């Protein structure tokens, strides 16, 4: 993918993501993995160091991905001293929905034609029977942890989250507000 460049008023050229970062805007437009999470975390930490009181804005269009990578971003957002505004554009699914819900209450946004989706953890395992069993136990613990996180973020109960996340559960912008994932439709 070619990354576009922009020229600012001073004639300086920037790649578009660096220029957006200057305005405290982070864009998540890929699935979650460790390298992507490290990049997002580094951007959050940089913005926090530059001004611990000024809002950060995260725009998300992602199908989700690695739960552990997403949880690293989630925890970093929650340790920020500044408010974090989140925006769903297109689709926030799976781990991307968790990140969307991590924004500061009242500052979690969704565009009017965007959608969200929650579901239970999925993955695979191979190896010895003992290794597979341990992986399954780990997946159950992640599922339980994510249900608690989403319950806290949305105001739903853990039991409700277990029900909603049993299968893919898609929501429109309006349904996402009703569900408690976001606060505003833009």
Predicted regions and their residues:
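Terminal-region recognition feature
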Residues: 1-186
């Amino acid at each position: 993918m070619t990354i576009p460049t922009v020229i600012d008023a001073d004639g300086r050229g920037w790649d578009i993501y660096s220029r957006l970062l200057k305005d405290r805007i982070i864009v998540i437009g890929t699935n979650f993995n460790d390298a992507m999470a490290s990049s997002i975390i580094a951007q959050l930490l940089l913005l926090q160091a530059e001004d611990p009181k000024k809002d950060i804005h995260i725009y998300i269009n992602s199908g989700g991905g690695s739960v552990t990578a997403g949880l690293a971003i989630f925890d970093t957002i929650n340790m920020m001293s500044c408010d974090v505004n989140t925006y769903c554009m297109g689709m926030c699914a799976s781990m991307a929905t968790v990140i969307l819900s991590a924004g500061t209450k009242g500052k979690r946004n969704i565009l009017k034609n965007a959608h969200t989706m929650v579901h239970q953890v999925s993955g695979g395992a191979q190896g010895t029977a003992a290794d597979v069993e341990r992986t399954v136990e780990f997946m159950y613990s992640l599922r339980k942890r994510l249900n608690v996180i989403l319950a806290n973020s949305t105001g739903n109960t853990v039991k409700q989250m277990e029900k909603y996340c049993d299968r893919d559960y898609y929501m429109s912008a309006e349904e996402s507000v009703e569900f408690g994932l976001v606060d505003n439709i833009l």
